Amino acid sequence: MAGAAGPGTVPGAAGGDGDDSLYPIAVLIDELRNEDVQLRLNSIKKLSTIALALGVERTRTELLPFLTDTIYDEDEVLLALAEQLGNFTGLVGGPDFAHCLLPPLESLATVEETVVRDKAVESLRQISQEHTPVALEAHFVPLVKRLASGDWFTSRTSACGLFSVCYPRASNAVKAEIRQHFRSLCSDDTPMVRRAAASKLGEFAKVLELDSVKTEIVPLFTNLASDEQDSVRLLAVEACVSIAQLLSQDDLEALVMPTLRQAAEDKSWRVRYMVADKFSELQKAVGPKIALSDLIPAFQSLLRDCEAEVRAAAAHKVRELCENLPTEGRETVIMNQILPYIKELVSDTNQHVKSALASVIMGLSTVLGKENTIEHLLPLFLAQLKDECPEVRLNIISNLDCVNEVIGIRQLSQSLLPAIVELAEDAKWRVRLAIIEYMPLLAGQLGVEFFDEKLNSLCMAWLVDHVYAIREAATNNLMKLVQKFGTEWAQNTIVPKVLVMANDPNYLHRMTTLFCINALSEACGKEITTKQMLPIVLKMAGDQVANVRFNVAKSLQKIGPILDTNALQGEVKPVLQKLGQDEDMDVKYFAQEAISVLALA
């Protein structure tokens, strides 16, 4: 395989003298054309190794032409190739030769598979930065023009992602050409191309001169926002955020707001959804004055939209919208123009809408302050705590800390309790799991007395749940509670209840005792572990069930480091030695492992 390889021929790695040190490279090169996809993929991923071995000149003259001609491979291989080439500038001789990487990437930017094209565009964008301004106009801009005027829509969609990276460093004449190409793609016959152009409109606007934004980008935005395809119109809404940031208030009001108002009332729910989804960014981009005059009315209609998806997206933005309002007059705007709509959503027919609102409504308490929260928000929180949908109740409980800062949790505690109990016993185990995870937070806010009186029994009940994930989470929960309430509380309240389970007829519950001891020993410290927990663990070493016995060995290994030498040598060692002779293989294995780890051999 020595000598120069023409396009389509695999470049040879080993020279005529049969240098053995290059043999692995020869293998990698052979694998580039192997029938096995996995081998080709493996070789492509090591392309930089091949290039290093060949040197910069042979990489340019042999490897790259070969790669350019093999663009008919499996998508997975092409994706890897597109990614590799983005980091190849140093391997072809540096920025002066970066243009050598353009032909294979240009081919990759036209293939059918979207992920490959996107990766090729990403690599081209990377390489564009490594071109000098002269090389950019000589090599990169012509590539963009070729893609932009290609016969296949695939090449034209790829071009859309390249305009913004080459525009800033181009000469004025070339800039005009680039803008012209972008304009024509915005009105392309193929919806996929118009979609690609719309998705890059905001990015392109940011690198243009202000005059061009007004005279060219805004008309393109207006056209795309009234495109016959809703998938194009919704992308224009996204671009509006970037465009709005570039214009003065007067220009915004005259040039952009009529189109945005129209989008908020679009006949397609997907476009209205996009307006709702981008609402906070739009609010910041247009500024407080226009937000009050134009966006608040639009937001009101989105909160009452006939489509639940749109109402849910708008509900998600309620807190951010209120926080972003200017502090002067904010309370009045929220109370008069937003709160009446929120009250309606609390009893919405759709649970996703109610759930979305429940995830943010608590945050309004910090914006509205103590009096308004007690008078206006508290009734809404209480209504949501009684909602038939568990996700709604859960979202309220998981955001309690917001309210606690403003009014204290006692106001809610009477209604909280039934909601917590219901969730704790919900038929869906994932709901039970979620409430367990909030228990340490709740405990900290409600205080130890309230917790002991109302919630302690729940936490103990979870330890014997029929789902293992719940029992496991309940064990971790106990450890966090001990860290919050201290060892004395653990000794008096938790440890006795846990240890009683060691005599439970169900072996799974007996094992839970061991898991709890593992979790609690560190938090409870040496004295409680030695005096209260260790005797129970040692007693359980004689359990009839092998699973319990090997968990005894694991528990002794876990709590061993906390115990003093006397307890280890006098009590733990004999029990582990006995378990080390057990008839069950697993028990024997874990006992011997514990002896080894605790250095008791």
From Swiss-Prot:
<feature type="repeat" description="HEAT 4">
    <location>
        <begin position="136"/>
        <end position="173"/>
    </location>
</feature>
<comment type="function">
    <text>The PR65 subunit of protein phosphatase 2A serves as a scaffolding molecule to coordinate the assembly of the catalytic subunit and a variable regulatory B subunit.</text>
</comment>
<keyword id="KW-0007">Acetylation</keyword>
<dbReference type="InterPro" id="IPR021133">
    <property type="entry name" value="HEAT_type_2"/>
</dbReference>
<dbReference type="GO" id="GO:0019888">
    <property type="term" value="F:protein phosphatase regulator activity"/>
</dbReference>
<comment type="similarity">
    <text>Belongs to the phosphatase 2A regulatory subunit A family.</text>
</comment>
<dbReference type="GO" id="GO:0005737">
    <property type="term" value="C:cytoplasm"/>
</dbReference>
<dbReference type="GO" id="GO:2001241">
    <property type="term" value="P:positive regulation of extrinsic apoptotic signaling pathway in absence of ligand"/>
</dbReference>
<dbReference type="InterPro" id="IPR054573">
    <property type="entry name" value="PP2A/SF3B1-like_HEAT"/>
</dbReference>
<dbReference type="InterPro" id="IPR000357">
    <property type="entry name" value="HEAT"/>
</dbReference>
<feature type="repeat" description="HEAT 15">
    <location>
        <begin position="568"/>
        <end position="601"/>
    </location>
</feature>
<comment type="subunit">
    <text>PP2A consists of a common heterodimeric core enzyme, composed of a 36 kDa catalytic subunit (subunit C) and a 65 kDa constant regulatory subunit (PR65 or subunit A), that associates with a variety of regulatory subunits. Proteins that associate with the core dimer include three families of regulatory subunits B (the R2/B/PR55/B55, R3/B''/PR72/PR130/PR59 and R5/B'/B56 families), the 48 kDa variable regulatory subunit, viral proteins, and cell signaling molecules. Interacts with IPO9. Interacts with SGO1. Interacts with RAF1.</text>
</comment>
<dbReference type="GO" id="GO:0060561">
    <property type="term" value="P:apoptotic process involved in morphogenesis"/>
</dbReference>
<feature type="repeat" description="HEAT 12">
    <location>
        <begin position="451"/>
        <end position="489"/>
    </location>
</feature>
<protein>
    <recommendedName>
        <fullName>Serine/threonine-protein phosphatase 2A 65 kDa regulatory subunit A beta isoform</fullName>
    </recommendedName>
</protein>
<feature type="repeat" description="HEAT 5">
    <location>
        <begin position="174"/>
        <end position="212"/>
    </location>
</feature>
<dbReference type="Pfam" id="PF22646">
    <property type="entry name" value="PPP2R1A-like_HEAT"/>
</dbReference>
<dbReference type="GO" id="GO:0051225">
    <property type="term" value="P:spindle assembly"/>
</dbReference>
<dbReference type="InterPro" id="IPR016024">
    <property type="entry name" value="ARM-type_fold"/>
</dbReference>
<dbReference type="GO" id="GO:0005634">
    <property type="term" value="C:nucleus"/>
</dbReference>
<dbReference type="GO" id="GO:0045202">
    <property type="term" value="C:synapse"/>
</dbReference>
<dbReference type="InterPro" id="IPR051023">
    <property type="entry name" value="PP2A_Regulatory_Subunit_A"/>
</dbReference>
<dbReference type="GO" id="GO:0000159">
    <property type="term" value="C:protein phosphatase type 2A complex"/>
</dbReference>
<feature type="repeat" description="HEAT 3">
    <location>
        <begin position="97"/>
        <end position="135"/>
    </location>
</feature>
<feature type="repeat" description="HEAT 1">
    <location>
        <begin position="20"/>
        <end position="58"/>
    </location>
</feature>
<dbReference type="GO" id="GO:0005829">
    <property type="term" value="C:cytosol"/>
</dbReference>
<feature type="repeat" description="HEAT 13">
    <location>
        <begin position="490"/>
        <end position="528"/>
    </location>
</feature>
<dbReference type="Pfam" id="PF13646">
    <property type="entry name" value="HEAT_2"/>
</dbReference>
<dbReference type="GO" id="GO:0098978">
    <property type="term" value="C:glutamatergic synapse"/>
</dbReference>
<dbReference type="GO" id="GO:0045121">
    <property type="term" value="C:membrane raft"/>
</dbReference>
<feature type="repeat" description="HEAT 9">
    <location>
        <begin position="334"/>
        <end position="372"/>
    </location>
</feature>
<feature type="repeat" description="HEAT 2">
    <location>
        <begin position="59"/>
        <end position="96"/>
    </location>
</feature>
<dbReference type="Pfam" id="PF02985">
    <property type="entry name" value="HEAT"/>
</dbReference>
<feature type="repeat" description="HEAT 11">
    <location>
        <begin position="412"/>
        <end position="450"/>
    </location>
</feature>
<dbReference type="InterPro" id="IPR011989">
    <property type="entry name" value="ARM-like"/>
</dbReference>
<keyword id="KW-0677">Repeat</keyword>
<feature type="repeat" description="HEAT 10">
    <location>
        <begin position="373"/>
        <end position="411"/>
    </location>
</feature>
<dbReference type="GO" id="GO:0051754">
    <property type="term" value="P:meiotic sister chromatid cohesion, centromeric"/>
</dbReference>
<feature type="repeat" description="HEAT 6">
    <location>
        <begin position="213"/>
        <end position="251"/>
    </location>
</feature>
<feature type="repeat" description="HEAT 14">
    <location>
        <begin position="529"/>
        <end position="567"/>
    </location>
</feature>
<feature type="repeat" description="HEAT 7">
    <location>
        <begin position="252"/>
        <end position="290"/>
    </location>
</feature>
<feature type="repeat" description="HEAT 8">
    <location>
        <begin position="291"/>
        <end position="333"/>
    </location>
</feature>
